[in-house]
A protein has these predicted regions:
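A conserved active-site cap/scaffold subdomain adjacent to cofactor or substrate pockets
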Residues: 175, 193-262
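Metallocofactor- and cofactor-centric catalytic cores in central/energy metabolism, strongly enriched
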Residues: 2-140, 154, 158, 162-167, ...
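Secondary-structure boundary elements
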Residues: 137-141, 163-170, 191-195, 223, ...
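Flexible, glycine/charged-enriched surface loops at secondary-structure junctions
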Residues: 37-40, 171-172, 248-258, 284, ...
Length: 370
């Protein structure tokens, strides 16, 4: 029923937006679900936005719930990390660089955007390599890149650190808040307050990791997962495959995004990451501390590690009152269940990070709520 997956070059995307194919998949999903109750979770910010844009939640069977999980790297960044980055901005002469979505995320008492308005030198970059250029142009000033993201963006950070070493840019460093996806999925699967019957697995992440790191979902929890693309037919195909596995009681990890994802991912990118980073424990917003779910810069590259290089006082962490971003991120509630949603918390005046990021669950729900 789904379109044949062509070679990566010269892809004709029209097949993945075909209304007839989409209708057939929707009808099949309705047939399979019947009067069952099935909860599926996507764990990719792009899927969050796409599901909202295409209105898929409103056309699914009544018993099929599509939940948003911890797929937005900005959203899962803990308040403590935001506060630490703000503290680094107070270093004399420091230049803080980061991606645009991080600017408005509230910390315990302020944000990077507010600190920039107050006179701190905080700059938006589109790549860590831009931060390297800034470091080269300002050799007498510390330039710190605040790095957040999952497996997709980590290789570029590793490459930037290696390039900084090659260019002798010792004034460059990275505040690393990177995370890895599989441990978070294990935490959700173990959460007694959530019931997830299947995972719409992130296509972007899987381009790096391949399929193997998600195998534990089946081995340990008998829960299926399907790596899914981002076009309408991609997503519907992934949902249909998951529902069929749930109904038939045959869980597996499958790939519905073969034009973008190889089963073994990108070994070269993974090797680059392993050269520069090592696993560490880290805290996720909503999920709390998760063992070996973060990445720390290896000791041999410690001169580029802003965490160990700069000893700065960080204020006591305070979570925003009433904000339920954490519950949204673990699938315990939907954004509309939060009492602040659409009232005191809007994209113009966000209380929590899920309303700040363009890929945040709350921002997507708000934008496509009608």
């Amino acid at each position: 029923m789904a379109p044949e997956q062509p070679a990566r070059s010269g892809i004709d995307f029209s097949a993945f937006r075909d209304p007839k194919l989409a209708r057939e998949l929707i009808e099949r999903i309705h047939e399979l679900v019947g009067d069952r109750t099935i909860n599926l979770m996507e764990v990719c910010g792009t899927h969050t936005v796409s599901i909202g844009r295409y209105g898929f939640r409103s056309i699914m069977p009544a018993g099929l719930k599509l939940l948003s999980g911890p797929g937005c790297p900005v959203c899962v960044t803990a308040n403590r990390d935001i506060d630490h980055a703000i503290a680094l901005a107070n270093i004399d002469g420091a230049i803080i660089t980061t991606f645009g979505d991080m600017m408005r995320v509230p910390g315990s008492s302020t944000s990077l955007a507010a600190q920039k308005a107050a006179g701190r030198d905080i700059r938006i970059v589109y790549s860590p390599l831009d931060a390297l250029d800034i470091a080269e142009q300002n050799p007498d000033r510390p330039v710190i890149f605040m790095g957040v993201g999952f497996e997709t963006t980590t290789p570029t950070i590793a490459a930037a650190i290696l390039e900084a070493e090659a260019r002798g840019l010792l004034n460059f460093s990275v505040y690393c808040a990177h995370k890895t996806t599989p441990p978070a999925l294990r935490a959700i699967a173990n959460d007694p307050e959530t019931t997830i019957d299947g995972f719409i697995l992130p296509g972007h992440v899987a381009t790096i990791t391949g399929l193997a790191p998600f195998g534990f979902l089946v081995d340990e929890f008998k829960t299926p997962g399907v790596v899914t693309g981002f076009e309408p037919v991609d997503i519907l195909q992934g949902i249909c495959m998951l529902v069929q596995m749930v109904v038939e009681g045959q869980p597996a990890i499958d790939n519905a995004y073969r034009r973008g994802v190889n089963a073994d991912g990108n070994p070269v990118a993974r090797q680059l990451v392993e050269q520069v980073f090592e696993p560490c424990d880290t805290t996720w917003r909503g999920l709390g501390p998760i063992a070996a779910s973060g990445l720390a810069i290896r000791p041999e590259f410690s001169r580029f590690d802003a965490r160990t290089r700069f000893d700065v006082p960080v204020e006591a962490t305070v979570e925003p009152r009433g904000c339920r971003c954490g519950d949204v991120l673990r699938g315990a509630i939907t954004p509309s269940d939060c009492p602040l949603f659409g009232r005191t918390c809007t994209p113009e005046h966000p209380v929590g990070p899920c309303m700040v990021s363009s890929e945040g669950s709350c921002a997507a729900y708000y934008r496509y709520r009608n």
